[in-house]
């Protein structure tokens, strides 16, 4: 364990990466350490904040699936509910996957389509402002319709709403303010997307059965806010993105082995066609997304350097 020390100014000294790395010092596998940390963190947070029940928007994707599985681990199936909110761009498979997931977890799943809500809002917007909603604005409207629905559920029934964004998305701003960022706590905000996949597989292995359907783990990540949309249409592939982020966001706060791997990966990427541009683009996205992170709910920390007090950057700055 690490020890908090007072500095000469009377404030606690920052906890360094080296200090934090001593926490899982009993030979615990990394994914099991993450599982236990998140489960304990949620259980403690909910108790101290007076919440007994949890609600999560279930998209049929891996982030919401893992969040639901961890919530059930922390508070029990009777205290967790999912809400699936299909739109015009939601695949039938996503709804079916949500049904299968919640059946495996033993939790109740509500279905609340947002098609009519989005259509009505878009029509009224055009009538008032003379321009139709299209492109990113229409995509974000769907995310905000879901976020508003979930917050209303939270208000009406007293459930704690969990956000489902992971560290990869949070780093580069691949999220919608007042949409999928709505909630009271984020469980995955310090896990990279590649770790989300790894922890999901570990959850199934730990349970000895398929809690998270394999089809959810295998499917290409997608926000499903536009026809045929995939995450890698907008971002580098997650194995590439995550190594850049480890090098840029956490750097030497990482273990020496993990930092050496990330640094070598980035160095090799620089030598490839388009590599320098990819690295620069990711760095710019991280800087420009600070304003989103400042408005996001608190996120449980499991890695050497988390956003928030672990990485303080100005919101308004010239990043070109």
Regions found by a protein language model. Name each.
Residues 6-59, 64-320:
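ATP/NTP-dependent adenylation/nucleotidyl-transfer catalytic domains that generate, transfer
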Residues 1:
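CN hydrolase (nitrilase-like) catalytic-core segments centered on the catalytic cysteine
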């Amino acid at each position: 364990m690490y020890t908090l020390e007072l500095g000469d100014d009377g404030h606690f000294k920052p906890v360094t990466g080296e200090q934090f790395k001593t926490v899982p010092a009993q030979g615990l596998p990394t994914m099991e350490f993450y599982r236990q940390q998140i489960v304990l963190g949620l259980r403690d947070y909910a108790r101290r904040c007076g919440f007994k029940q949890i609600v999560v928007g279930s998209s049929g994707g891996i982030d919401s699936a893992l969040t639901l599985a961890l919530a059930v681990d922390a508070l029990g199936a009777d205290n967790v509910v999912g809400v699936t909110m299909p739109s015009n761009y939601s695949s039938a498979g996503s709804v079916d996957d949500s049904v299968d997931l919640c059946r495996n977890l033993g939790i109740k799943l509500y279905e609340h389509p947002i098609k009519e809500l989005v259509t009505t809002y878009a029509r009224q917007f055009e009538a008032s402002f003379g321009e139709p909603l299209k492109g990113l604005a229409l995509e974000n409207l769907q995310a905000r319709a879901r976020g508003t629905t979930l917050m209303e559920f939270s208000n009406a029934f007293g459930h704690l709403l969990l956000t489902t964004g992971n560290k990869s998305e949070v780093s580069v701003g691949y999220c919608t303010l007042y949409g999928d960022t709505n909630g009271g706590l984020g469980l995955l905000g310090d896990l990279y997307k590649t770790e989300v996949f790894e922890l999901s597989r570990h959850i199934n292995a730990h349970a000895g059965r398929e809690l998270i359907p394999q089809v959810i783990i295998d499917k290409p990540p997608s926000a499903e806010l536009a026809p045929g949309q995939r995450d890698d249409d907008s971002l580098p592939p997650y194995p590439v993105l995550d190594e850049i982020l480890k090098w840029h966001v956490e750097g030497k706060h990482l273990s020496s082995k993990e930092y050496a791997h990330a640094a070598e990966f980035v160095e090799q990427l620089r030598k490839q066609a388009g590599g320098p541009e990819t690295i620069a683009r990711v760095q710019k996205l991280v800087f420009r997304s600070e304003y989103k992170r400042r408005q996001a709910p608190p996120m449980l920390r499991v890695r050497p350097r988390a956003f928030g007090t672990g990485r303080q950057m100005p919101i308004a700055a010239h990043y070109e």
